[in-house]
Amino acid sequence: MCIRDRSYGNEFTRANNPLECGFKRYCHLEDGIDYIGREALLKIAEDGPERHIMGVTFGGEALSGVAVPLAVIAEDGTVVGEVTSGIWSPRLGCNVGMSMIARGHWDAGTRITIRDSDGKLRDGTVSSLPF
């Protein structure tokens, strides 16, 4: 598994906008071409997206993959996102994943906790992509 490419259905769905997903360069916001949704995207670009796809690294036993989204929890206990794809990285010696994370929590280096599919809490860190 390559934790680099964003996958429709995992990292993003129809519920997300292209700016959350890192696809701003495909939106042609500056060239004046009109299309359905352009005004909404301009507003999101002005205000900033509510969520963003980021990498996460976290400890614990090796994951064989992420079958269901795993909660990303801020230091105050608030769920601020979800890990949508993940696996053990032998090169980094930890679990890595892609996550949709809320504004204010997506800066690389931010300390987080991941709740795995067994309910165990794992210490983690938000990271830039690619790893």
Predicted regions and their residues:
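Conserved, structured C-terminal
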Residues: 4-131
